[in-house]
């Protein structure tokens, strides 16, 4: 299994966004410290997801950065990504582990300790925990759990916890103090005037 970077960048494929340009800038700043999670809109076709994932994987390769595919594990397998990430509405964790095999990286979204423990028992490599703060990137999310909620999950499991949801460089120290191994971001990098600089700021906060 590849080493897990502390900064996870989730691709922003909303209309008007340019995910590949953002990924290029972030990789130039973070290199192998970056994990890129390819996430597409629900309306995207599998072919569109495949094309984006293949291009992101090609960008990651020279840096030794890890590429994962969110939700669509068949796409992860098709492009030979390092693994994938599943949420509550995706495949059950045990089924996702079966699809990826014993060595694939499997991230699982969790919100509270009980679900987190169940996910780890079923085969999760790491947990994406949140939302930590309010975010406009993804609609329909539950109320934020804050750093306290992150700590509750960290105390319950023995795998890396990646805090997600409204994460900014200013909020990273509190999340790290709560035990988070790293953070996952969308808007903090993709909406920044300088995605490379934003990536550097996040990495410094994580150090």
Predicted feature residues:
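Conserved N-terminal beta1-alpha1 strand-loop-helix module at the mouth
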Residues: 1-85, 90, 98-125, 142, ...
């Amino acid at each position: 299994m590849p080493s897990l970077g502390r900064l996870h960048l989730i691709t922003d494929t909303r209309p008007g966004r340019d995910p590949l340009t953002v990924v290029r800038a972030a990789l130039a700043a973070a290199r192998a410290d970056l994990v890129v999670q390819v996430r597409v809109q629900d309306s995207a076709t599998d072919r569109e997801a495949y094309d984006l994932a293949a291009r992101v994987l090609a960008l990651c390769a020279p840096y030794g950065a890890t590429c994962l595919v969110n939700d669509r594990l068949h796409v992860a397998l098709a492009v030979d990504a390092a693994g994938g990430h599943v949420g509550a509405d995706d495949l059950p964790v045990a089924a996702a582990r079966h699809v990826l095999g014993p060595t694939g990286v499997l991230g699982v979204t969790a919100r509270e300790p009980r679900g987190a423990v169940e996910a780890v028992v079923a085969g999760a490599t790491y947990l994406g925990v949140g939302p930590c703060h309010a975010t406009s990137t993804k609609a329909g999310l539950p109320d934020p759990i804050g750093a306290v909620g992150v700590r509750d999950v960290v105390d319950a499991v023995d795998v890396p916890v990646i805090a997600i949801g409204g994460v900014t460089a200013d909020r990273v120290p509190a999340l790290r103090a709560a035990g988070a191994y790293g953070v996952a971001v969308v808007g903090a990098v993709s909406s920044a005037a300088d995605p490379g600089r934003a990536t550097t700021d996040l990495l410094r906060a994580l150090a």
